[in-house]
């Protein structure tokens, strides 16, 4: 996707990180050229966790897709379902009732809380600060318990329906959530204090991976990564969806643009989330949870749905041809937008800062992997679906020997098998 | 002859030392875990790890010097076990002693780090090489301040012989008269054992397992054992030098465990330092502060 080729020396020392590496929770491949301890060039290859979900949506109906798209990400599952529901509702020309919208927003903010606390632990672990890691994840259990009490699930909450939500909030649950939030607020204040005052930790974060507002704008970063560089980029504010008009949030900004700012922004965002959840609980609009009637076939048309996932802007493009299945669903997750910043910011830094800078964008590889570009030298032709299918069949036939797949292997090698080295770059 | 063999193989060297090392490792891991709000390992976990590792196949990477690859862990453990003889374990007088054995002991304790570095350089993998570079860089960072910190009590006792130093201290707690030396010695020991925050040489999120990345089975077990033994030796040395010299074994064990608790707390409090930060810390503060301590000691003599 992006390669800085500074080094032409023969004795370049490349540190491969991934696809299997303790710093990565998911498969991705980075190559860092280093001199001593300093990174001089960086490149990335994504696509290891491509699951064919977009293609999969085309063979499932509108309702079934809700459950599959929710499984794109294990951490921000609710926001994917929300983006999809909002898009489909837009296509169908309906709108979920206000109570449902408010509950959508509340679950989304609870999810953000869980995601940011998870990230805090993860980032502390990359810095070798195991104690903070363990404590952050212990406290994250509080919000997981809240989500479980609310929806019955800790991870894939399935709170959304086309045209509404599945779960209501009872008074008992509301008081339990309030209690949990009080505890979390106190803990978050403590963590904010730790990351801004612990001298050893600050040595690893302050002034490291600095991205100016101009750079952030040029690299097109989104979410907390952009906001830590002083760029106001928050879909909740720019284009309010769900109930964000009735229950607005204030975007949290920091100007420093370094790793410390990314910690501060994410932690201060938690206070925003706690505040808005409290306001929603206190002023939950009355009414239905779900529309009386949601069409099974969606009118032909195209819709774009943007929401603010914990990591930044999540983008859905949905096209319907009037049938009960989508014609095309396109998902762009925030990690993709932020990945280029990692490559830019790591060059010139210590190797020890690399995992920190990488985790600073809160990467989520499998959410991000949509497919691969097959590059063969100067061959830039567009391949048809049939040709691509044939390449795939031949590739696996070559791997399994002469047997072939379903007898489709006609000649020994109509196209040479495509070794992984040729699968470079990444296609959105 | 039989008594010499017993000394070497059972007590205080050899088997008892390996068991003590594993016990201390367990306690360190357990304390750290409890401080980090985790459950931590069961009491026999280090033993179980050793049994498992020793029983496993040792994979030797292609293209390495096989003799070095297999031999280095043995040398590392042997170095640590030899140092046992000169150290007043459990508050008892050392099993062997000669003038200048302090320097030899410190050298023997460094052997483990040296062997780890060589093992990493020999393995040929990229993570191993980086780990080896960092291990050796760190050795040059903490070794001099560590040795200088151990020389403080030697200056007081006017001897380079561990037995004479502990006798010369004669129950005085140098911790109170030489607090800087005490801290530098203890923190230097953490650097030697590559404990957080000095675990850059084996930072798993950057270079997997550092110098020992390619090691498995027996070699890894021996390196781990060497490190465990060295932890006991280092803590004993600091306790003997700074916490009142020789005393009855129970009191001495308690002092050693107190030091272990201290390093467990320090480990749990800090994030990992980058290797350049580690070097900077030792030379900018560690070495200078110990020098200051020396000047105070010398000044005190003339008063």
Predicted regions located by residue number:
Chain A
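Active-site bordering "gate/hinge" segments
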Residues: 2-428
